[in-house]
Amino acid sequence: MRKVIGIGETVLDIIFKDNKPVEAVPGGSTFNAIISLGRCGVNASFISEAGNDRVGDYIIKFLRENGVNADNVSTFPDSKSPVSLAFLNTKNDAEYIFYKDHPHDQLEFTYPDIQPDDIVIFSSYYAVNPVIRPQVLGLLDYARSHGAIIYYDVNYRPAHKDDVIRITPNLLENLDYADIVRGSNEDFATLYKKDEADKVYNAEISFYCKQFIYTQGSQPVEVRGGKDFKKSYPVHNTSIVSTIGAGDNFNAGFIFGMLKYGITRDDLLRGLTEEQWDKAINCGLNFSADCCKDIFNYVSREFGEQMKG
């Protein structure tokens, strides 16, 4: 059975509507994707750090309750759980304030068992943070040498716009390791001041990675697969309660689609067929739509049970 290994931050998301807190849920970009995959019966594990506090204990318990292996989530004596405040606007899109001590990030883990065509997902500032770069790079190198598929969600927030020059070498290295790159229009506006899929792909991505997914909220998903493949996919119409986990769950769905339809690293190196793209993107859109129906950051347990079938 193929496995999915995620590496990323853990955060407690406190969600506000009309400036009042309405929910507090465990979060983090890769974390959200891994929880959704766990709910869908995928063999999933997570590598991270959690605070040495009640929130950290809750996050580790939450991973395990959702079928995710949390053996590589470390706690350190002086670490505190990071918090993000997510303020939902009238469209139920979120604006964030992060309370996280990035310079004191720590990461210790034993390399998990990785077999050919297992999938490693990583994302966000965590993926480029210089403080933990040696450990993240070590995992990418290990995954590549063992034949894994590497899925990189750029997910670069405007809060870090002043760090772009400093993290660019790590960003480029990530793009080079990746078999698939996904990013949003907001990510690339922050990084490159570019706001069209073709401009981003041709100028910034295609030299490093041929398989590219460009999401833009409620607008169509743009896919570029080398010189030969280009397609737009309309987003599913759904009632939206929160978009906080939309992109993370698109990642989960796309990865679920790769597993379900037997898409391998060799397929990616050759370039996916239109049918393969169609199936995997549709899974991504289904996961994203389900997540947006509620205030939580992941697909519902009911959706997960349906996917297991």
Give the role of each language-model region.
Residues 128-199, 219-220:
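Conserved beta-alpha-beta core of the PfkB/ribokinase-like small-molecule kinase fold
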Residues 113, 171-174, 205:
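Structural alpha-helical scaffold elements that stabilize or flank donor/cofactor-binding regions
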Residues 1-69:
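Glycine-rich phosphate/adenosyl-contacting loop at the front of the ribokinase-like
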Residues 116-118, 147, 178, 209:
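Short, well-ordered alpha-helix to beta-strand connector turns
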Residues 2, 195-309:
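Conserved phosphate-binding/catalytic region of the ribokinase-like
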Residues 38, 64, 141-145, 175, ...:
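Anion (oxyanion) recognition and catalysis
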Residues 43-124, 307-309:
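Conserved N-terminal subdomain of the carbohydrate kinase-like
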